[in-house]
């Protein structure tokens, strides 16, 4: 596992026809060794608390960045 990978959430204001503007959260894997984002999933959720819980869990269990999208999909299916 790579202890230097940190999962972060990034808020972004988006627009969708029929909905209007809304805030959603992207989740990214930041590699401290490379000083760069190595994986990102856009527009994961509009629920800030859920995005925080996801990042906390990914950091706690040191999720590999290659599994980020799959882990997010699995967590969203469980809601």
Where in the sequence are the language-model features?
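Detector for methionine-enriched segments
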Residues: 1, 9-10, 54-57, 75
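Short N-terminal "domain-start" leader segments
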Residues: 1-28
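Phox homology (PX) phosphoinositide-binding domain
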Residues: 2-4, 31, 48, 58-61, ...
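A short, structured beta-strand/loop element
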Residues: 19-44
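A short, exposed loop/beta-hairpin motif centered on an aromatic-Gly-Thr core
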Residues: 35-53, 57-59
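Short, mixed-charge low-complexity intrinsically disordered segments
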Residues: 61-79
């Amino acid at each position: 596992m790579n202890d230097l990978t940190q999962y972060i959430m990034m808020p972004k204001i988006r627009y969708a026809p029929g909905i209007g503007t809304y805030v959603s959260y992207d989740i990214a894997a930041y590699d401290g060794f490379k000083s760069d984002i190595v994986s990102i999933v856009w527009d994961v959720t509009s629920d800030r608390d859920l995005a925080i819980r996801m990042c906390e869990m990914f950091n706690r269990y040191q999720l590999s960045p290659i599994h980020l999208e799959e882990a997010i999909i699995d967590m969203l299916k469980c809601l």
